[in-house]
Curated annotation (Swiss-Prot):
Native species: Homo sapiens (Human)
Biased segments, Low complexity type: 116-125, 275-288
Domain of life: Eukaryota
Any GO BP: regulation of RNA splicing
This protein's UniProt keywords: Activator, Chromatin regulator, Metal-binding, Nucleus, Phosphoprotein, Transcription, Transcription regulation, Zinc, Zinc-finger
Name of protein: Ataxin-7-like protein 3
Gene name tied to this protein: ATXN7L3
Domain notes: The long N-terminal helix forms part of the 'assembly lobe' of the SAGA deubiquitination module. The C-terminal SGF11-type zinc-finger domain together with the C-terminal catalytic domain of USP22 forms the 'catalytic lobe' of the SAGA deubiquitination module.
Assembly and binders: Component of some SAGA transcription coactivator-HAT complexes, at least composed of ATXN7, ATXN7L3, ENY2, GCN5L2, SUPT3H, TAF10, TRRAP and USP22. Within the SAGA complex, ENY2, ATXN7, ATXN7L3, and USP22 form an additional subcomplex of SAGA called the DUB module (deubiquitination module). Interacts directly with ENY2 and USP22.
Residues covered by region (Disordered): 116-184, 275-347
C-alpha cells in the first residue's frame, strides 16, 4: 500500500472538501486578479475602448458613396487644384507645384548653392587626382596645355588607326614641324618601345629624345633638345637599347669641309652678279629702259627679253648657291681683338 493512499484514507470527507475549496479559491483569485490588472493597464494606457464602436463618431467618418460627391461627402470639383502643406515652411502649396517648391525649400534643387558647392568640390577632387597621376616628364606636352576635356576627345580620336588626322604632321608649340622620318610618331602621347622593331627603334633614337617615362612607360618623342630630360638620361637609354658602343647623336650635324666652302659660294655669287641691277629699284629700272629706248631708237624687245632671262638665271643660281651655303653650319668666327680705349692711355 502506497504512502499517498494511506494519508488520504486516514482523512474523513469533511477535511477533503475543505482542502478542495481552498485550492479552488486560490485559482479563482489568481484569474480574477489577472483580469483586473489587464483592464487597469488598458485604461491607464488609453487603449481599453479601442475595440468599442461609437455610433456618432462612425457617422462622422462614414464613407459616402453618392453621385457628385467624394468619399467625404463634399461636392467634387475637378477644376479645383489640390493643396499640400510644405513640411519645411508650413505653407499650403498647390499639388502641381509641390515637388519644385520642396526641392527649392529643402535646398535640393538644380540651382541651389549646396549643389553648386558639391560640384565645385567634386571638380577639385578630380583635378587633384588627374594631377597626381600625370607624369612629371610630360608636363609641357600639347595635350596638357589644351585642357582635360579636349584631352579625352583627342585620345579617343587617336585610338582610331584609320583616322586621317594621324597621318598629318603635328605642329609643336614653338612652331617646328614634326619629323619627316619614314617612322612618324605622335609627339603628344609618346610611343611604347615594346611595339617597335630594331630599325624603328634605331631611327627613333637617332632623331628624337627617347627617354622612357617612369609612369607611362612610353618613350619621349621630342627632339634631342628636349628640356625635360638630360643628356645622361638619353645616353643611358641608348646604351640600354643599342649596346655600350652607342653614342648620343649631335643636335646639329655639320657637313664635311671638303663638300662645300663658304668662300666658294661668295666667289660664285660675286661672279654672277649683274652690273648695277641689284641696286636699282623697279621704278629706276623702268625709267632707264625708256631713256635708252628714246636715246638710241633701237628695238628693245629682244634686248629686254635677253636681260630678263639673264636676270632670272642669275637669281636662280644665286638662290641655289645661298641654299647650299645655308645647309652648312657656319664656322665660328674668331673673337674680335679688344678695341683700345682712352683708359689704356691713362693707365
Amino acid at each position: 500500500m502506497k504512502m499517498e493512499e494511506m494519508s488520504l484514507s486516514g482523512l474523513d470527507n469533511s477535511k477533503l472538501e475543505a482542502i478542495a475549496q481552498e485550492i479552488y479559491a486560490d485559482l479563482v483569485e489568481d484569474s480574477c486578479l489577472g483580469f483586473c490588472f489587464e483592464v487597469h493597464r488598458a485604461v491607464k494606457c488609453g487603449y481599453f475602448f479601442l475595440d468599442d464602436t461609437d455610433p456618432d463618431s462612425m457617422k462622422d467618418f462614414e464613407i459616402v458613396d453618392q453621385p457628385g460627391l467624394d468619399i467625404f461627402g463634399q461636392v467634387f470639383n475637378q477644376w479645383k487644384s489640390k493643396e499640400c502643406v510644405c513640411p519645411n515652411c508650413s505653407r499650403s502649396i498647390a499639388a502641381s507645384r509641390f515637388a519644385p517648391h520642396l526641392e527649392k525649400c529643402l535646398g535640393m534643387g538644380r540651382n541651389s548653392s549646396r549643389i553648386a558647392n558639391r560640384r565645385i568640390a567634386n571638380s577639385n577632387n578630380m583635378n587633384k587626382s588627374e594631377s597626381d597621376q600625370e607624369d612629371n616628364d610630360d608636363i609641357n606636352d600639347n595635350d596638357w596645355s589644351y585642357g582635360s576635356e579636349k584631352k579625352a576627345k583627342k585620345r579617343k580620336s587617336d585610338k582610331n588607326p584609320n583616322s586621317p588626322r594621324r597621318s598629318k604632321s603635328l605642329k609643336h608649340k614653338n612652331g617646328e614641324l614634326s619629323n619627316s622620318d619614314p617612322f612618324k610618331y605622335n609627339n603628344s602621347t609618346g610611343i611604347s618601345y615594346e611595339t617597335l622593331g630594331p630599325e624603328e627603334l634605331r631611327s627613333l633614337l637617332t632623331t628624337q629624345c627617347g627617354v622612357i617615362s617612369e609612369h607611362t612607360k612610353k618613350m619621349c618623342t621630342r627632339s634631342l633638345r628636349c628640356p625635360q630630360h638630360t643628356d645622361e638620361q638619353r645616353r643611358t637609354v641608348r646604351i640600354y637599347f643599342l649596346g655600350p658602343s652607342a653614342v648620343l647623336p649631335e643636335v646639329e650635324s655639320s657637313l664635311d669641309n671638303d663638300s662645300f666652302d663658304m668662300t666658294d659660294s661668295q666667289a660664285l655669287i660675286s661672279r654672277l652678279q649683274w652690273d648695277g641691277s641689284s641696286d636699282l629699284s623697279p621704278s629706276d629700272s623702268g625709267s632707264s629702259k625708256t631713256s635708252e629706248n628714246q636715246g638710241w631708237g633701237l628695238g628693245t624687245n629682244s634686248s629686254e627679253s635677253r636681260k630678263t632671262k639673264k636676270k632670272k638665271s642669275h637669281l636662280s643660281l644665286v638662290g641655289t648657291a645661298s641654299g647650299l651655303g645655308s645647309n652648312k653650319k657656319k664656322k665660328p668666327k674668331p673673337p674680335a681683338p679688344p678695341t683700345p680705349s682712352i683708359y689704356d692711355d691713362i693707365n
